């Protein structure tokens, strides 16, 4: 039912689209989705996401969409102006950016995307055909920048295609979430450049039942105890763990698709991939046959230091839209700070979007899940300053370290990264405002 599907998605969060489909982006088939896709966002959704069944989409109809949210969206972000810079002026993106900036996320709306929904101002509309939310792109303090922002859902709404695939298929999508390891993997055939780091710490984790394994304190202990670990097949971090001896190949199971039923059926005997900002709440509060705590360790804490949900684009756009990015990136930096400090307004937009989508994408999400995610993002410093106290800035040495670790992993997977790949090929700090930090 919808509930299982909803949890399904939570489990996956960024992970399914990132890890399973990033490989899809590396195959030559990905860009062929292009032809019709660029005509409109709706066609993209239809062409890439047969699974969601466009037949159900129109039933809820856009008639209900505009009402959702226009009333509930408070002046996003006016409660805190944050610190440092980020003071935008009215209309400042008009004429230098596309009239509608489309940003592709990697899942259906959830609090992990809050820093984007934070920029959607009053009078937004929810489109339940293509799972998007459109409103005036509003900077910190309620400043209307003069362009529209459309936040596009991913995951089940886009047939689980990776954002890299979707950006190459539809050039009207200016920006999308790309994890650093995915950028490394696709650097030879489908390169992307990230212009803002997103999550300084990837929310992905491995979780286990503390009642079954009271002595397990981390992922390496799961390896020692030979516990079965379910994950999304193709995830590079897992190949890193098995090739470096953290886990062994015979204990990992790549069949996981986000459904909680196997974890529940195993009664705590197996471990599983998830998001630290999502599953612990779901399993303790919502999954009826579980309803007890789980314990977890973040993947970043075991050496695979990935940035998550970085804001990235196709390389040609770096020059083409440099004037736009120079103004837009500081707005994203400040929006991230505003959301982290005061998530209520953007969470209201997220919940309105989920309600507006109805059952079209098999996603359920509630206030408790949104509140838990926002609190965890702050508490566990998933959003945090980068080098020099600057939010959104990439640590080039850290990216270089991940490239070094990832090259043998992806080469073994038959999707070798670009020869001689450097951090500057996949990330840039050129548009970052150094005065903006938490």
Mark where each language-model region is.
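Pocket-lining segment of extracytoplasmic ligand-binding domains
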Residues: 181, 257-360
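Secondary-structure end/capping motifs
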Residues: 321-413
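C-terminal motif of bacterial Sec signal peptides marking the signal peptidase cleavage site
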Residues: 8-12
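Extracellular mucin-like PTS domains
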Residues: 19-84
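Bacterial signal peptide processing site
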Residues: 13-17
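Short, solvent-exposed loop/beta-turn-alpha elements that line the ligand-binding surface or hinge
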Residues: 125-144, 296-304, 319, 381-394
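Short, glycine-/small- and polar/acidic-enriched structural segments
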Residues: 84-256, 263, 270-273
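Conserved C-terminal helix/tail region of periplasmic/extracytoplasmic solute-binding proteins
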Residues: 78, 87, 396-438
């Amino acid at each position: 039912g919808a509930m299982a599907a909803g949890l399904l998605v939570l489990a996956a969060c960024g992970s399914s689209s990132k890890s399973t489909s990033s490989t899809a982006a590396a195959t030559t088939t990905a860009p062929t989705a292009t032809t019709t896709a660029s005509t409109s966002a709706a066609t993209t959704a239809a062409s890439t996401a047969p699974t969601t069944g466009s037949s159900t989409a129109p039933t809820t109809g856009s008639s209900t969409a505009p009402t959702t949210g226009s009333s509930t969206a408070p002046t996003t972000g006016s409660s805190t102006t944050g610190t440092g810079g980020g003071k935008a002026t009215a209309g400042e993106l008009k004429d230098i950016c596309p009239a509608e900036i489309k940003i592709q996320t990697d899942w259906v709306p959830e609090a992990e995307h809050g820093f984007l929904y934070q920029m959607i101002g009053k009078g937004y509309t929810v489109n339940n055909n293509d799972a998007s939310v459109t409103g005036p792109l509003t900077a910190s303090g309620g400043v209307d920048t003069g362009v529209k922002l459309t936040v596009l859902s991913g995951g089940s709404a886009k047939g689980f295609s990776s954002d890299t695939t979707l950006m190459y298929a539809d050039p009207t999508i200016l920006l999308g979430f790309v994890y650093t390891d995915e950028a490394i993997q696709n650097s030879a055939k489908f390169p992307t450049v990230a212009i803002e780091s997103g999550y300084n710490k990837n929310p992905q984790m491995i979780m286990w039942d503390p009642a079954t394994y009271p002595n397990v304190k981390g992922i390496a202990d799961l390896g020692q105890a030979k516990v079965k670990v379910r994950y999304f097949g193709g995830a590079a971090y897992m190949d890193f763990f098995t090739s470096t001896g953290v886990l062994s190949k015979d204990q990992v199971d790549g069949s996981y698709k986000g459904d909680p039923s196997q974890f529940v059926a195993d009664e705590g005997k197996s471990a599983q991939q998830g998001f630290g900002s999502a599953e612990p709440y779901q399993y303790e509060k919502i999954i009826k046959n579980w309803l007890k705590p789980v314990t977890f360790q973040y993947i970043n804490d075991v050496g695979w230091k990935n940035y998550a949900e970085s804001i990235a684009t196709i390389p040609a756009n770096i020059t083409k839209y440099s004037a736009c990015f120079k103004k837009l990136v500081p707005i994203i930096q400040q929006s991230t700070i505003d959301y982290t400090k005061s998530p209520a307004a953007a969470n209201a937009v997220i919940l309105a979007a989920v309600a507006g989508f109805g059952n079209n994408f098999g996603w359920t999400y509630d206030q408790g899940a949104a509140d838990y995610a926002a609190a965890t993002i702050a508490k566990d410093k998933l959003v945090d300053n980068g080098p020099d106290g600057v939010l959104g800035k990439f640590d080039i040495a850290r990216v270089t370290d991940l490239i070094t670790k990832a090259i043998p992993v992806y080469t073994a997977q038959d999707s070798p990264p670009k020869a001689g790949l450097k951090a500057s090929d996949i990330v840039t700090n050129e548009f970052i405002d150094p005065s903006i930090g938490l």
